[in-house]
Amino acid sequence: MAGRLLGKALAAVSLSLALASVTIRSSRCRGIQAFRNSFSSSWFHLNTNVMSGSNGSKENSHNKARTSPYPGSKVERSQVPNEKVGWLVEWQDYKPVEYTAVSVLAGPRWADPQISESNFSPKFNEKDGHVERKSKNGLYEIENGRPRNPAGRTGLVGRGLLGRWGPNHAADPIITRWKRDSSGNKIMHPVSGKHILQFVAIKRKDCGEWAIPGGMVDPGEKISATLKREFGEEALNSLQKTSAEKREIEEKLHKLFSQDHLVIYKGYVDDPRNTDNAWMETEAVNYHDETGEIMDNLMLEAGDDAGKVKWVDINDKLKLYASHSQFIKLVAEKRDAHWSEDSEADCHAL
């Protein structure tokens, strides 16, 4: 009798401990998920604050902007150690290399003149005619007539390949759909238990890296127009289509780009083209084709600056141009799609 009572007591205790364990794990996972959601929505905001700070700890947010050689050249930047990236860190011996590409100095319509030219008086930190010189991250400083990169030193002054002094505004359309099997059912990742999201990626001609199909905002152009135009040019080769084909593409893109969308990020981008005086900023927007019907009727074809184009499964193994991997990660989190096998498996198993 005593043995049976002891057995029941032990079973009850074991059940209580098991339930407590599940409760704790569930609570922990909910906490982790809540943290992830909060983190994903503020990651770039926090990073931007760090970049515009002065403590010199920039290794995670200002790395590609210090790489050498500078893209499309043999120019080597002056080396900038992590602890001396921030402008408020005194560095009297800082001697950055001066470089502006010949293609920029040739004076194309998308490029500013040199600061030294007498007839050039840019209005920094404001709208300058049709040119947007305001930064999405707030005011930036001007030193000796040149704007100063809010993220810190890059080891190179001038504009490099960038046309504008100060912020150079771009737009990155992230087009997504669910990965489906031959029967049209959404495919779930076997470890995370979350559905697999795909996005349209292009292989850049200039550097050979895979990227989001985006591009520069033309003077006076709305961001929404840039997003649609760039996707059409790079992922659908719209520039080489007949008038009738262009109209058909436009109709289908209008349907995709006029629906609800997610603004993933606005602001400074850690880009290998950045210099001390010119830098990239972007607005990354996610347009999701929930059923896949819109994109099924559009044939992907690389065009303009793209060498290749394809649908790519989204996961943490992606290696993309500039900060594009972080944009894609945020999309996966916002859409509650698969990203990593490691971080989500425990919580999904509950």
UniProtKB/Swiss-Prot annotation:
GO terms for MF: ADP-ribose diphosphatase activity; ADP-sugar diphosphatase activity
E.C. number(s) listed in UniProt: 3.6.1.13
Transit peptide location: 1-46
Residue(s) carrying Phosphoserine: 121
Translocase as UniProt keyword: no
Cofactor: Mg(2+); Mn(2+)
Manganese recorded as keyword: yes
Extent of motif Nudix box: 215-237
Similarity field: Belongs to the Nudix hydrolase family. NudF subfamily.
Biological role: Hydrolyzes ADP-ribose (ADPR) to AMP and ribose 5'-phosphate.
Domain Nudix hydrolase, first and last residues per copy: 178-334
Organism: Homo sapiens
Alphabetical keyword list: Hydrolase, Magnesium, Manganese, Mitochondrion, Phosphoprotein, Transit peptide
Subunit structure: Monomer. Interacts with GLOD4.
Gene Ontology CC terms, in alphabetical order: cell junction; cytosol; extracellular exosome; mitochondrial matrix; mitochondrion; nuclear body; nuclear membrane
Name this polypeptide is given: ADP-ribose pyrophosphatase, mitochondrial
Catalytic activity: ADP-D-ribose + H2O = D-ribose 5-phosphate + AMP + 2 H(+)
InterPro entries assigned to the protein according to its UniProt record, in alphabetical order: NUDIX_hydrolase-like_dom_sf (IPR015797), NUDIX_hydrolase_dom (IPR000086), NUDT9 (IPR039989)
Tissue: Ubiquitously expressed but isoform 1 is the most predominant isoform.
PROSITE patterns, per database record: NUDIX
